[in-house]
UniProtKB/Swiss-Prot annotation:
Swiss-Prot/TrEMBL keywords: Glycosidase, Hydrolase, Secreted, Signal
Bias-annotated ranges (Polar residues): 172-182, 192-203
Region (Disordered) residue spans: 80-203
Listed Low complexity bias regions: 80-95, 103-171
Organism: Staphylococcus saprophyticus subsp. saprophyticus (strain ATCC 15305 / DSM 20229 / NCIMB 8711 / NCTC 7292 / S-41)
Name by which UniProt lists this protein: Probable transglycosylase SceD 2
UniProt xrefs under InterPro entries: Lysozyme-like_dom_sf, RPF
Record carries keyword Membrane: no
Length: 249
């Protein structure tokens, strides 16, 4: 294991490359206490981090109890390290710098991904706002459907009225009178009721028939008149007196 402590930016370069200001010298040549420096490095590193071990530039390297120690300074910046061999220490320092650089590089793309999420959220928002437009366009379709249904009903009513008019023109009476004729005589123009004396397609009583029949058919049973004459008389009575003249109406 090798521990390297760098006290300044300039010292980082010195620690990694192994180049230091001043001449390399053994601790005994610099007049330093190896045991004291080794003990400080192992048990009290804060004191070594606070200030250089001596004034001026120095480059002190020694081995104490099978552990290498290195103390360097260019007169302004300083560093120190210890471990099992300087080669291993240099490798450890280089690996640490590389790991830090890789970690910073790996963290940067994660920060870049955040705007993409924001853009995605912005893209989704217009899709939600489009929903009311769909509802607005559906309403005219419903109105158009209602209008179409109303038009169909009106058309059916017109067709029904036209059909009734056609029937009325072909038989001489309206649809209601046709129903009355079916109930009164089954449509038989010669039908006669012996008990009441009513006769004809619409079962006219004699007095009623005389009030609406042409002069040449008055005083005669309605059953003796042609169907067209009976129809005209029935329609006249219906228009002037209403359907209440027939019990079966």
């Amino acid at each position: 294991m090798k521990k390297t402590v760098i006290a300044s930016t300039l010292a980082v370069g010195l620690g990694v490359t192994g180049i230091a200001a001043g001449n390399s010298a053994d601790a005994s040549e610099q007049g330093v206490d190896k045991a004291q420096l080794a003990q400080q490095a192992q048990s009290n590193p804060e004191s070594l981090n606070a200030a250089p071990i001596q004034d001026g530039a120095y480059n002190i390297n020694f081995n104490y109890n099978n552990t290498d120690y290195s103390f360097q300074s260019d007169g302004e910046n300083f560093s120190w390290s210890y471990g099992e061999g300087s080669g291993e220490g240099s490798n450890a320092s280089s690996e640490q710098a590389t790991d830090n650089s890789s970690q910073q590089t790996a963290e940067q793309p994660q920060q870049v991904e955040q705007p993409q999420q924001t853009e995605q959220a912005s893209t989704e928002q217009p899709a939600q706002e489009a929903a009311p437009q769909t509802e607005a366009t559906q309403q005219p379709q419903q109105e158009a459907t209602t209008q179409s249904a109303s038009s169909s009903n009106e058309s059916s009513s017109n067709e029904s009225s036209s059909s009734e008019a056609s029937e009325s023109s072909s038989s001489g009476v309206n649809a209601h009178l046709q129903q009355i004729a079916q109930r009164e005589s089954g449509g038989d123009i010669h039908a006669t009721n012996p008990s009441s004396g009513a006769s004809g397609k619409f079962q006219f009583l004699q007095s009623t028939w005389d009030s609406v029949a042409p002069a040449e058919y008055q005083g005669q049973p309605a059953a003796s008149a042609p169907e067209s004459v009976q129809d005209a008389a029935a329609q006249k009575l219906y228009d002037t007196e209403g359907a209440s003249q027939w019990v079966t109406a």
